[in-house]
Amino acid sequence: MSLENKNIIITAGGTGGHIYPALAIAELLRQNKANVTWVGTPNSMEASIVPEYFNIQFIKSSGVRRKGIIKKITFPLKLAYNTLRSRSLLKKLKADLVIGFGGYVSGPICLAAALINIPVIIHEQNAKIGLTNRILAKFATTICLAFEIENLHKQFSSKQLAKTKLVGNPVRKDIVALNDKARIYTDSSTLKILVLGGSQGAKAINEIIPKLIRKSNEQGINIKVWHQTGKLSLEETKDAYKDISQNHIKDIAAFIDDMATAYNWADLVICRAGALTVSECAIAGLPAIFIPLPSAVDDHQFFNAQNIVNNNAGFCLRQQQMTLENLLAIIKPLNQDRSKLEQMSKMAKKTLIKNSSEQILDCVKKILNNK
C-alpha cells in the first residue's frame, strides 16, 4: 500500500530515548511518500533536534509524576485544555494516523486523536511501560513494544493484549549496518572501552573511569577509552584525566555525533541502560557493562538490561555496586581471554528484534488499509 498523500503525525519528546526511534520511523514514512508532521513541546530537546529534519508543531504539555499537590490538582484541567488544542491541531493537519513514542506530549495528542476516531499507534521503548503509555493503551489501535514486558497480562486487559505487537526499538541505519559485521577480538594489548553516560552524562561513571584506568595500569591491563561525558561534566572529567597518558585516551567529548563509528571502534562499553543504548548495543553486537540510572522511573533501566544480561551478552551493576573492584572483576577475565568478548558479541546479536522500523511501517499500512 502506498502512503502517498497520507498525513501522519509523530509525537515524541523529552529525551533522546523517545526522539531518536521516532526520527527513524519518521524518515521511513517519508521514504514511503507520507506527509510527516512532528508534534512536540517548545523549549525541549525535540525543539532543537527535529526542525532540521521535519516540520514540527508545538503544544505545551507537562507531566504529573513527583510534582507538588497544586500541580497534581490542576493537571486534569491542563490535560483537558491541551487535548482540546491537540484536537484542533489534528483537524487542521487533516491527520490520517498518529504515532506516539512517549514523553508527556504524546498524552494529549494521542487522546485527542482517539476522541475524533483517528487511529493511534503507541510505541513503548522501555521494558517497563511508562505512565503515559499505560493510559494511552486503552485508546490505541496498536500497541508496539520494544521488549518483552514482565507480567504484561496483569497490566493489560485481554483486549489490550490482543492489539500488542513486539517490534523492538527502531535504530538508525548506520548502526543497523553494524549487525552484519562480525566482531573480531584479537589478543591486542589494548582493551578499547567506550564510556557513555546517556545524553545528560553520568557523574558517577565519569568520576570512576579515570580511576579505573590507573588501577588497571597497575595490574597490567592496558585500557584505552572513548569517553562521552555529557555537556555538564566535560571540563570536570577532563581535569580528572590530566595525569593519564594520552595513550589511554581516544577522545573525551560532551557528545559523540557518530555513534556507529564509536560502537565499531570499541571492544566493550560501560554505559547507562536507556532503551535506545541497550538496543544499539544488541544490534552492534557490543558487549556491555550496564549501570542503570538509579532515579529512572519504575527502575526501567535495570529491566531494559536484563534480556542482554540473561543471555550472557553483558553485565549489570547497580550504581552502588560500581566499585573499582567489581569493574576489574569483570574486565580482567575479558582482557585475558578475548574469545569471551567474541562470544558475548554473538549472543548480544541474538537478543535483538530485527527490522523494527519495517514492522512498525507494516502496522501503519495495515491500519490505513482498513480505515
Swiss-Prot record:
Entry EC number(s): 2.4.1.227
Record's keyword annotation contains Transport: no
CDD domains hit by this protein: GT28_MurG
Residues annotated to bind UDP-N-acetyl-alpha-D-glucosamine: T15, G16, G17, N126, R172, S199, I256, A275, L276, T277, V278, S279, E280, Q301
Record membrane topology: Peripheral membrane protein
Keywords from the UniProt entry: Cell cycle, Cell division, Cell inner membrane, Cell membrane, Cell shape, Cell wall biogenesis/degradation, Glycosyltransferase, Membrane, Peptidoglycan synthesis, Transferase
GO BP annotations, alphabetical order: carbohydrate metabolic process; cell division; cell wall organization; lipid glycosylation; peptidoglycan biosynthetic process; regulation of cell shape
Localization in the cell: Cell inner membrane
Metabolic or biological pathway, per its Swiss-Prot or TrEMBL entry: Cell wall biogenesis; peptidoglycan biosynthesis
Main location: membrane
Reaction equations catalysed: di-trans,octa-cis-undecaprenyl diphospho-N-acetyl-alpha-D-muramoyl-L-alanyl-D-glutamyl-meso-2,6-diaminopimeloyl-D-alanyl-D-alanine + UDP-N-acetyl-alpha-D-glucosamine = di-trans,octa-cis-undecaprenyl diphospho-[N-acetyl-alpha-D-glucosaminyl-(1->4)]-N-acetyl-alpha-D-muramoyl-L-alanyl-D-glutamyl-meso-2,6-diaminopimeloyl-D-alanyl-D-alanine + UDP + H(+)
GO cellular component: plasma membrane
Domain of life: Bacteria
Molecular-function GO term, any one: UDP-N-acetyl-D-glucosamine:N-acetylmuramoyl-L-alanyl-D-glutamyl-meso-2,6-diaminopimelyl-D-alanyl-D-alanine-diphosphoundecaprenol 4-beta-N-acetylglucosaminlytransferase activity
Family: Belongs to the glycosyltransferase 28 family. MurG subfamily.
Stated role: Cell wall formation. Catalyzes the transfer of a GlcNAc subunit on undecaprenyl-pyrophosphoryl-MurNAc-pentapeptide (lipid intermediate I) to form undecaprenyl-pyrophosphoryl-MurNAc-(pentapeptide)GlcNAc (lipid intermediate II).
Name of the protein in its database record: UDP-N-acetylglucosamine--N-acetylmuramyl-(pentapeptide) pyrophosphoryl-undecaprenol N-acetylglucosamine transferase
